[in-house]
């Protein structure tokens, strides 16, 4: 029957078709077997490789943190030595005569100030560099951790979509 240019047929999209169900199931099983044979290994390999990369990043972050702490300790020692040296210069300046006292004290103060400011600048630079490296590593780890958490919280449909996407990416990279 034809009504306003639209053909109305008996039955509809929601009527079950046993032949279609059978062939859909057969096709699904075949695709599943093909994926298991050819894609499962690369997917697991990629996941293991990612796990190793994450562990390596964590180890590098710990190493960077340890190096930063060592650099901070070293810089504190340098600052302490610079302060001690400045005090020594001041004491030696006081031992000289009244005539030379003003010149020596002035030199000692300027040298001490230069050394302290230089040491402080060096400490600040090292501290900023170490903190930047640590922030970058922590940010990378946080992103990777968030990715893992998100991957763990996906439902079955989203996981299938991600697996399909990964398979397509793998096939693109192979070709």
Curated annotation (Swiss-Prot):
Membrane topology: Single-pass membrane protein
Transmembrane segments: 20-40
Superkingdom, taxonomy of origin: Bacteria
Record-level Gene Ontology MF annotations: proton-transporting ATP synthase activity, rotational mechanism; proton-transporting ATPase activity, rotational mechanism
Chain's role: F(1)F(0) ATP synthase produces ATP from ADP in the presence of a proton or sodium gradient. F-type ATPases consist of two structural domains, F(1) containing the extramembraneous catalytic core and F(0) containing the membrane proton channel, linked together by a central stalk and a peripheral stalk. During catalysis, ATP synthesis in the catalytic domain of F(1) is coupled via a rotary mechanism of the central stalk subunits to proton translocation. Component of the F(0) channel, it forms part of the peripheral stalk, linking F(1) to F(0).
Subunit structure: F-type ATPases have 2 components, F(1) - the catalytic core - and F(0) - the membrane proton channel. F(1) has five subunits: alpha(3), beta(3), gamma(1), delta(1), epsilon(1). F(0) has four main subunits: a(1), b(2) and c(10-14). The alpha and beta chains form an alternating ring which encloses part of the gamma chain. F(1) is attached to F(0) by a central stalk formed by the gamma and epsilon chains, while a peripheral stalk is formed by the delta and b chains.
Name assigned to this protein: ATP synthase subunit b 2
Source species: Prosthecochloris aestuarii (strain DSM 271 / SK 413)
Gene from which the chain derives: atpF2
